[in-house]
Amino acid sequence: MDTMQFIACVLQNACRIRGYKLGHDGSDGYSDCIGLIIGALALGGVPWPGINGTNYTARYLVDGLRQNADLKMGDLVFKARSPGEKGYDLPPRYADSADQLDYYHVGVVLQADPVRIVHCTAGGVRLDEKRGDWQYSAWLRLIKNQQTYAATVTAENGSTVNLRQGPGLQYEILRQVPIGSAVEVLGETDADWACVAYQGMEGYMMRRFLAPRLSQEDERYEQIILLRQQLDAIQQAVLAAQKALEELVKTE
């Protein structure tokens, strides 16, 4: 399974999850945080090789676990607590582990810039658009790190993005590529630059101007997740308003 297939399966699994239950993987409509990933892999025919748990995953199933590093599409991200921190609850099986952090929550990076992280929490499936407490990131060994993918050129300002001869601002501009253009990412040079192909020409473009292109089906899945999240927020606001109204009526 490559990166884009993994993302597609994560979104597909997220859309069938209706609620949170510990130890579930989405196949029956319920999931916990790691179950979102386990169920996604199952949809792609990849079996889970160990314990259903975020601490197990962070210790045995990922490469390059790092803190506050640049995110990549397809990364797993973790929230963690240190010994003595409120809520710290590292399972006893890891008492002898060199790493004593409690990795208590996990999500998947759908997009690195701007950030979009999908995860399953007590309130259901959520899409985070800020990094927040997602301090740790790593690559799941079960996924082939896909360097080549289709992307759309994007920027908040201006009408074009520069395609350069090399990976740096000092290199000559080969083309000014219009925002919204489709390009093929051939490889990521470093945290800032990627090699891309545009209309038969190869060059380098800053990664922050490249948004991976999801299939129409994947975009629909993502929209379903967002709409459900918005609906949940509205329902919670209505319940809070009803409670406040009841309290006011009691005081009359």
Placement of each model-derived feature along the sequence:
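Soluble non-cytosolic domains of exported or imported proteins
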Residues: 27-32, 168-171, 232
